[in-house]
Structure formats: C-alpha cells, structure tokens
Amino acid sequence: MANSRQIVALNVGSQRVSMGVFSKTSKDALILDRYATRLVVLDPSAEGLRLTKIGEAIADLVQELNVKGSVANYSVSGQSVFIRFVKLPALDDTDVEQLIRFEAQQHVPFPLDEVVWDYHLLPAKGLEREAVLVAIKAEDLDSLNDEIVSHNLSTGKVDCALTSLYNAYVDSYPDEKEPVMLIDIGAKSTDLIYSEQGRFFTRSISAGGIFVTSAIAREFNISFMEAERL
C-alpha cells in the first residue's frame, strides 16, 4: 500500500534488479528501512526476454516490500546511457541552455527528438564552465518505464547508474576532500568514476561479469546457465 512519506528507489541492472525503501529523519537524513534484490540471469542468446524477466523481478519486489501504488525513482544501467562532458565559454545563464542544446546536437549520437536528455552544470573553474550531458534513447526509456508502471508502481525521478553512484558517494561523504575512484563492476559493463573537489569524470567499459561466465562456458563446453552456477 502506498505511503506518501516513504521513498522507493529501484535500480535496474543487466542481471540484477534491486529495490530499497527509505524514510527521512527530521534532519532530512535518509534511512534505509527495507531492501530486496532479484537476479535476472539469462543466456545472452535470450536477450529478447530480458525486459519481461525484469518485469517479473519488479513484481516480486513490489509484493515483498509492500510498496504497491508507490512512486518509484529509478536508475538505468550505464550501458544504455550516453554521457559526455562538454566545456562551455563564460556566458550569462540565459545563454547557457541554448549553447548546451547546440553541444548536445553535436555530441549525442542520435537525433535529439529520438532521445530523452538532460544536463548538469559543474562548478566553474575560472572563466570556463563545464556541463555533463546525459541521454538515453526515448524508446528504450519508454519501454522500461511502461514495464515498471505495469507492476503497480508509478514513476518519479529517473537517473543513470553512474550519476546515482556518484551522488550516493557525495551524500554519504560530504566532507571528503581527497580524490577517489569509484568502480562498479556490472554484468555487461564496468563503470569508473573519478571524483575530485566537487568535479567528476566517468568512463564505462564494455567488460563485466557476463564475459567471464561466457568464457567459462566455452572453456568447459557447458551452457551459460551452468557456468553461471559455478
């Protein structure tokens, strides 16, 4: 049953779907009240079934955590998201959005009317400014969003796994001044985030746990699912 005071977060990865239910203290600190996760392990040859399996995992989590009718804020895996950092000249704030749209047209590898995109301005460094562009194909986001909604949830904020991880780190360690490297090893990709003095840089590498499983399957001439269980 929906509770307007709780915050539901959903993380949709390639082989794992996780959900957390949070509450806020009087000082706006977040407390994790409940958490559950489901594996979505598929042979790469059955990729067409992934969205259906993700939906089944979401349905299980909704029931287990009793969040039917809640608003879910969710993140999508870095592999499906395009991220680019762009440098901007010193401009009035009124000109920034127009310039960033121009930069998005140059850098995003799809027509802008086919993607959902947004940007965030990073702290200024001298006269130069920098922004991070984030984009995902609209059809991919719509398919995932529809799947989530079909399992007794409505959707709220959407983020990508890379920036979600960075934001979680900054919120958890607000006084940290030393440079840090965050590494998230997923099934299909590995995300690297370098953070220093309020600025961050990201790189997503197309290498993850699924490649290890596939190599084991080939080496021992067994099925992908058997290799995954080893």
Describe every region a protein language model picked out.
Residues M19, A29, A46-E47, V76, ...:
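Switch/connector loops and helix/strand junctions flanking conserved nucleotide-binding motifs
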Residues M1-R38, A72-S75, D171-V212, I216:
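Gly/Thr-rich phosphate-binding beta-strand-loop-beta motif of the actin/hexokinase/Hsp70
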Residues L42-A46, D142-L165, Q197-L230:
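Glycine-rich phosphate-binding loop plus the immediately following alpha-helix
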Residues D33-E64:
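N-terminal phosphate-binding loop and adjacent alpha-helix
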Residues V71, S75-D171:
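Active-site neighborhood for divalent-cation/phosphate handling
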Residues I58-V71, I222:
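Phosphate/pyrophosphate-binding loops at sites that engage ATP/ADP/AMP, CoA/4′-phosphopantetheine
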